[in-house]
Every structure is written in C-alpha cells, then in structure tokens.
C-alpha cells in the first residue's frame, strides 16, 4: 500500500487495485476530519455518539478526497455474518443520505459504476475484490466469525452468481 499525499484526508491506497483502472479505493485513517474529543478527527460512525453533522462533514471530506459523489456511498450493516448483498443504483446513499432497508450485511458487491462500497473496521479484516473481466467489485468485513465462516469465499460465490466472476480473475 502507499499513503496518498497532498489531500485533506490522508488515505492508504493499494496499487494492485488501482492498476485495474475500474475502481477508486482508499482506506481511511483517523486523520483529516472535524470530529472532536474521543472521536477526533475522522470518525465515520453514526452509531458511537459523535455529532451527526461532524460525521456527515467527514464523509463530505472523504468523498472529495476520493473524487466521488457524497450521495453514492452504500454502507454495510455489519453484524459478523457472512451475508453478502448485491447493490445497485437504487442503493446509492443508503446509510448516509437514505435509510438502509436491509440488516445483517457484512459484504457488498456491485457492477454499478460510481457506487462507493463502504465497510468498517476496528480489529477485523477488510476484504477487497476486483473482477476486471466483468467490471465488478466487492468489499467485505471479516471478523473472527466471518473468517471461520469463510466470508471471502461467500463474497466470491456471490460475485460468481451475480456477475459470472471466476476466482482466478480476481484482484484482491
């Protein structure tokens, strides 16, 4: 990985994923936001007690750093499952500007350009999947339960079912 430079919000980038040319990606740090106190500064959680407007501003800054639309984020609803959801243009903004109409989702997959798949981590593992052949992507959250439950395999299986993805073609 490498740390992006010259932006308000520092992001870790993964060159292997960038080289595919079909995905913008970034892994946030705690830097570059407006949250204060124990949430300082780049808090991206609406569920931990931070000021909602501060979290929204943090997402605006993140969207700017990624050069994506703020209302295109799509959030998981992580509960340490192996559930994967295909998201479409109708899901844009769910979790940030619209209510989610789903629960218990630890992985997201899409072939819809412009959507920003968003997963969250503390001590769990981020899983990134890029299928350059079918121009599809996936992101999954895998804690110990997801790892034991084979979250990576569940995500690949969902991508194969929905997009025809073959594991041999994936950049992870």
Stretch-by-stretch model annotation:
Residues 3, 24, 114-116, 124, ...:
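Surface-exposed, charge/polar-rich loops and edge strands
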Residues 15-19, 64-67, 164:
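A general structural signal for short secondary-structure junctions and capping/turn motifs
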Residues 52-142:
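Phosphate-centric recognition/catalysis
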Residues 36, 83-85, 146-149:
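Short acidic/glycine-rich loop or secondary-structure boundary segments that cap or lie
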Residues 1-14:
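Short, Gly/Pro- and small/polar-rich lid/capping loops
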Residues 11, 44, 109:
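Short clusters of hydrophobic/aromatic residues that line enzyme substrate/ligand-binding pockets
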Residues 16, 20-61:
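Intrinsically disordered, low-complexity, positively charged segments
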Residues 6, 20-25, 39, 71, ...:
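Sequence-level motif detector for i,i+2 pairs with an aromatic at +2
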């Amino acid at each position: 990985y490498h740390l992006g430079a010259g932006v308000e919000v520092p992001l870790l980038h993964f060159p292997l994923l960038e080289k595919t040319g079909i995905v913008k990606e970034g892994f946030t740090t705690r830097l570059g936001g407006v949250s204060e106190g124990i949430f300082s500064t780049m808090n991206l959680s609406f569920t931990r007690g931070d000021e909602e407007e501060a979290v929204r501003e943090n997402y605006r800054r993140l969207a700017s750093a990624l050069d994506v639309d703020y209302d295109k984020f799509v959030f998981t609803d992580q509960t340490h499952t192996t559930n994967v959801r295909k998201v479409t243009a109708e899901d844009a903004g769910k979790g940030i500007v619209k209510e989610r109409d789903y629960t218990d989702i630890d992985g997201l997959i899409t072939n819809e350009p412009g959507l920003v798949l968003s997963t969250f981590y503390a001590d769990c593992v981020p899983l990134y999947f890029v299928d350059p052949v079918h121009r599809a992507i996936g992101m999954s959250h895998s804690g110990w339960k997801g790892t034991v439950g084979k979250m990576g395999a569940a995500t690949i299986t969902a991508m194969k079912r929905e997009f025809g993805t073959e594991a041999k073609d994936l950049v992870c």
